Amino acid sequence: MNAEKSPVTPNVDHEEIAKFEAVASRWWDLEGEFKPLHRINPLRLGYIAERAGGLFGKKVLDVGCGGGILAESMAREGATVTGLDMGFEPLQVAKLHALESGIQVNYVQETVEEHAAKHAGQYDVVTCMEMLEHVPDPQSVVRACAQLVKPGGDVFFSTLNRNGKSWLMAVVGAEYILRMVPKGTHDVKKFIKPAELLGWVDQTSLKERHMTGLHYNPITNTFKLGPGVDVNYMLHTQNK
């Protein structure tokens, strides 16, 4: 799974792209398929801004930006934001929403590996949220993110742990019982253990700074960040 990719073999899962293309028009529907992303975005944004020492005036790259929920919110914080995605329809939605909102975001359709070949060391902050589990070679994405950030810059990852609890919560619970996301959104075999992600990070110039869990309470229908990384988790790293 972690073999080196040649320049002519993009790190893309076309089935995964198709899933998100099919529902792209509803990306900004606060009650639609992406409702959970809208709900957790303030937590993500707050964590990123706090750990990075603010976003104002910084050059930020959002890898796997989709319809632009996080990218747009970081631009509102005063960052100069580029959003990368390989899905044409989500990017069209992102561009239109930014235009309607009067927000400047530069959206680009290319892989992070392609972007790294042209823009190495150009970003103060790189974010990669819930994207690693949707590509054939997540380690390649981690390497590219490390190449893109400036010395001393910050890189943030979020993904899902691979264990019985995460399968129960993220697949059975979220997709089939609570129907928070469309069925088939997640494949537990592609989930990533924190030790695996940290192992990939250790093979780059990045250094782990902080890790936190993202927790959902079905009784109160609320999300929060806190200790425990057995389901969703976020990782803050910094370039050496």
UniProtKB/Swiss-Prot annotation:
A Pfam family assignment: Methyltransf_23
Annotated positions binding S-adenosyl-L-methionine: R44, G64, D85, M129
GO biological process: methylation
Catalytic reactions on record: a 3-demethylubiquinol + S-adenosyl-L-methionine = a ubiquinol + S-adenosyl-L-homocysteine + H(+); a 3-(all-trans-polyprenyl)benzene-1,2-diol + S-adenosyl-L-methionine = a 2-methoxy-6-(all-trans-polyprenyl)phenol + S-adenosyl-L-homocysteine + H(+)
Signal peptide: none
EC number: 2.1.1.222, 2.1.1.64
Entries under PANTHER family matching the protein: METHYLTRANSFERASE (PTHR43464), UBIQUINONE BIOSYNTHESIS O-METHYLTRANSFERASE, MITOCHONDRIAL (PTHR43464:SF19)
Database matches in NCBIfam families: UbiG
Family to which the UniProt record says this protein belongs: Belongs to the methyltransferase superfamily. UbiG/COQ3 family.
Name of the protein described by the UniProt record: Ubiquinone biosynthesis O-methyltransferase
